[in-house]
UniProtKB/Swiss-Prot annotation:
Molecular function per GO: heme binding; metal ion binding
Pfam family, one: CFEM
Propeptide part(s) removed at maturation, as residue ranges: 222-241
Disruption phenotype: Leads to defects in hemin and hemoglobin utilization as sole source of iron.
Phenotype for residue 72 to H: Impairs the heme transfer within the CFEM proteins cascade
Protein name: GPI-anchored hemophore RBT5
UniProt subcellular location: Secreted, Cell wall; Cell membrane
BP GO annotations: cell adhesion involved in single-species biofilm formation; endocytic hemoglobin import into cell; intracellular iron ion homeostasis; single-species biofilm formation on inanimate substrate
CFEM domain residues: 26-137
Length: 241
């Protein structure tokens, strides 16, 4: 039964234009025996846990478009209608390293199942789509890096400008404040000196008047000065006030 299944696979694959079996190989012996059951399908089960999230739904493609038993890994690997559907889904949903990871896992599982090179047999159009998906991620990464670099330079320039503006404003404020404080100090000092001089002058005048008055009183009391002289002294004292 298994031999008939493998023979039908080889015949269908050849008719569909899939890579031919290398000459000299026996199509009945190149496929290892596989378990005749699968939780998803023979292609997905053994690599599902290692797939990137973007590809996990892709490997759940229906196997009804193929003559393969759903559990037959080798048969599914050589069916372009199944492999192509998986590949197109990956190209739409995955980018960059994710694409490379899926291709590597698919190649590995198909090689382990005994399929000949190129192992995972997808149409050329699907291969091109996968290549573009991988390249698109690389270009996006480069653009993102450039944008981040430009943003960082702009931010740095703005910070430098802000610091220079703040420094200039601080310097200007200091210059404006210094003359005002100096002028105020000078005015205060001048006023203090004027007040001190005035107080000194008043003190001296008071002292002189007191001295004169003392002399006049003493002379009057002694009775040694004529009345006219005493009157003149009193007039002189009065003039001082």
């Amino acid at each position: 039964m298994l031999a008939l299944s493998l023979l039908s696979i080889v015949s269908i694959a050849s008719a569909a234009g899939v890579t031919a079996i290398p000459e000299g190989d026996n199509p009945y012996t190149i496929f290892p025996s596989v378990a005749k059951t699968a939780s998803i399908n023979g292609f997905a089960d053994r690599i599902y846990d290692q797939l990137p999230e973007c590809a996990k739904e892709c490997v759940k493609q229906s196997t009804s478009s193929t003559p393969c038993p759903y559990w037959d890994t080798g048969c599914l690997c050589v069916m372009p209608q199944f492999a192509g559907a998986v590949g197109n889904c990956v190209a739409k949903n995955c980018k960059g390293k994710e694409v490379g990871s899926v291709e590597s896992l698919a190649t590995s599982i198909c090689s382990s199942a005994g399929v000949w090179e190129p192992y995972w047999m997808i149409p050329s159009s699907v291969s091109d789509a996968l290549a573009k998906a991988a390249d698109a991620a690389a270009e996006t990464t480069a653009e993102s890096t450039t944008a981040e670099s430009t943003a960082a330079e702009t931010t740095k320039a703005e910070e430098t400008s802000a610091k220079e503006t703040t420094a200039a404003e601080t310097s200007k404020a200091a210059e404006s404040s210094a003359p005002a404080e100096t002028s105020k100090a000078e005015e205060t000092s001048k006023a203090a000196e004027t007040t001190k001089a005035e107080e000194s002058s008043v003190a001296q005048s008071s002292s002189s008047a007191a001295d004169v008055a003392s002399v006049s009183v003493e002379a009057a009391n002694a009775g040694n000065m004529p009345a006219v002289a005493i009157g003149g002294v009193i007039a002189a004292v009065a003039a001082l006030f």
